[in-house]
Amino acid sequence: MRQCIATRRVYSGRLLRVDVDTVRAPDESVLELEMVRHPGAAAVVPLLSDPESPDPQVLLLRQYRYAAGGPIWEVPAGVLEPGESPETCARRELTEETGARAEHMDYLTTIFTTPGFTDEKIHLFVASGLTTGAPQPMSDEFLEVEARPLSKVLQMIRDQEIVDAKSIVALLYLAGFKLGL
């Protein structure tokens, strides 16, 4: 287990912070590690149709991502606000990005995004019993919402059309562990 000896903040921004931690490693050596501190996030797989149907419809986003060099397919997601629960965040992001509201929000799992340099965790959910509405994206979000059958979404993962890690994990977790596909 690593033990933190000291932390030095080198950057603090709107979304994240960067620290240089001096840590004692399991072998008792002392290391300096750059750590991206993130408040955490939630992501949600919205099922437009009954999850028990043979091929449920999934709402996907085609969202412009500067870091990815353009638009990519993903599930709705966003950063936890201070004091906000992961489920509340998932519900908020679902409504903001798709316009939908969920009667049911079920927890799937929690993942570390890149534990080699960040403490970011994303809490994954599946939403069902949706009522649709108009998306209300933030001013820096450029996205389109599309419904696709889950079979097509899984094919998009196989064909590398969906390359966003949180979305792949959430969709495959849902298909494999919740729906038994």
What is the predicted role of each segment?
Residues 30, 51-53, 131-133, 180-181:
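Short helix-loop capping/hinge motifs at secondary-structure junctions, enriched
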Residues 2, 6-7, 71, 82, ...:
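Nudix hydrolase/Nudix homology domain
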